[in-house]
A protein has these predicted regions:
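Nucleotide-activated donor-binding/catalytic signature segment of Leloir-type glycosyltransferases, i.e.
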Residues: 241-262
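Short hydrophobic beta-strand element within catalytic cores of glycosyltransferases
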Residues: 296-300
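A short, histidine- and acid-enriched strand-loop-helix "catalytic/donor-clamping" loop
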Residues: 92, 106-124, 134-137, 141, ...
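Short alpha-helical donor nucleotide-sugar binding micro-motif in glycosyltransferases
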Residues: 258-259, 266-271
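Conserved acidic donor-binding segment of nucleotide-sugar-dependent glycosyltransferases
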Residues: 311-313, 317-324, 332-339
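Conserved donor-binding/catalytic core segment of Leloir-type glycosyltransferases
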Residues: 5, 181, 192-212, 218-221
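Aromatic "clamp/platform" in nucleotide-sugar-dependent glycosyltransferases that forms part
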Residues: 279
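Donor nucleotide-sugar binding/catalytic pocket of nucleotide-sugar-dependent glycosyltransferases
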Residues: 133-185, 192
Length: 375
């Protein structure tokens, strides 16, 4: 069985679940730079290592989710593996390890959650080219990010696309069981009195709510019938948004604090429409989760999961975050058309059934290990 060292920043729940699945096919060691992120709720963590070895490195935290120190480089230097993978290449500790690999001829892969096709400042672009072009392969999630990698001079033969996810096949089964009870049942359970419900999930701490486009949702709430509830699940709202709701009398806007996976499932099952109006998400796994519950999606064009998983007129709409009139039109169109929401939701479910941990693992086994037959 091949040995794999996987270097990442945090034990996020979806990563831990993937590692436990991937670890069935290799001798997997996961190196974590940190125990947690400065911007995440302390309850946001994985369940633990079952099929892999986990090591928390002694590194100094930098910013939200990066680290510095030589522990990662030293571990890589002292331990050989058939496959070496880095994820958080913008972290100083990971940069140091990659530079060592380049200088000493150690082969490595880089994996990405996603990303935008953007033009970097000159010096930053040079640094990225040095770090990334030394990799023997790049695993990424989206066509948009593939364009970016190619713009850095990465050969297309070294780029591999994989289905990024936070859901298992059991999650899909459980979602089916929940939604079979009907959305009205779950509206009552979570305390939503409105006839219909628009749901979004994300942190107000991201640019004070503007990063997730909550200002757009508040403007929409002002235009919508109060029988349509807008539910924002995440952390505590900022004072600005609390005051906005009070001053405009938006009683149909509901601010809900952090919810764990089990409680959040009730909100997905209660919703009629899911939206993510982010001003910058390199992926956005809540889109995957919402599609599991058969929800139509309205996503901004700055959420990579939306641009990758949502097809206009099939399972939702991708909208220009700066075009409020079109955004309003799409919301009013979908929330008022029951048949279209059902059709779009069914298409969402079919699409996301291709994005499970099993399929993500099979992709990695094929790309990194040469397929199951070579294990």
């Amino acid at each position: 069985m091949k040995t794999v060292i996987f270097c990442t920043n945090l034990p996020s729940p979806y990563r831990v679940d993937f590692f436990n699945e991937f670890g069935k096919y290799c001798e997997l060691t996961v190196l974590y730079e940190r125990h947690s992120s400065a911007e995440r709720n302390v309850a946001w963590k994985g369940t633990g290592a079952e099929n892999f070895k986990e090591i928390y490195l002694e590194l100094k935290p930098v910013g939200v989710d990066r680290s510095k120190g030589s522990a990662l480089k030293n571990y890589v230097k002292e331990h050989l593996a058939d496959v070496l993978i880095f994820t958080n290449y913008v972290s100083p500790a990971t940069m140091e390890a990659i530079v060592w690999c380049r200088l000493h001829g150690r082969k490595y892969y880089i994996e990405y959650d996603g990303g935008f096709n953007k033009k970097d400042p000159f010096v930053k672009g040079l640094l990225k080219r040095f770090l990334l072009k030394g990799a023997v392969g790049h695993l990424t999630t989206a066509d948009e990010h593939i364009k970016y990698l190619k713009s850095l001079g990465i050969d297309k033969s070294k780029i591999f696309k994989y289905p990024f996810t936070s859901i298992s096949e059991m999650d899909i089964i459980n979602a089916n069981v929940l939604t079979s009870k009907g959305r009205s049942y779950f509206k009552q359970k979570v305390g939503i009195s409105e006839n219909k419900m628009i749901l979004t999930v994300g942190r107000f701490s991201y640019e004070n709510g503007y990063g997730k486009g909550y200002d757009i949702l508040m403007r929409l709430a002002e235009c919508m019938d109060p029988s349509i509830g807008i539910c924002i699940v995440g952390d505590s709202p900022t004072k600005e948004f609390v005051d906005w709701k009070k001053e405009k009398g938006l009683e149909h806007v509901h601010f809900v604090g952090f919810k764990g996976k089990a409680d959040l499932a009730d909100y997905y099952a209660a919703a009629d429409l899911f939206t993510i109006l982010s001003r910058g998400d390199v992926w956005g796994l809540v889109v995957n989760e919402a599609m599991t519950y058969g929800l139509p999606i309205i996503s901004s064009d700055l959420c990579i999961a939306g641009t990758e998983l949502v097809k206009d007129g099939e399972n939702g709409y991708v909208v220009d975050i700066d075009d409020f009139e079109t955004i309003k039109q799409r919301f009013l169109e979908l929330i008022s058309d029951d048949d279209k929401r059902v059709s779009f939701g069914q298409n969402s479910f079919r699409k996301i059934s291709e994005y499970t941990f099993r399929q993500m693992t099979e992709n990695h086994v094929s790309t990194l290990l040469g397929g199951v037959e070579n294990i």
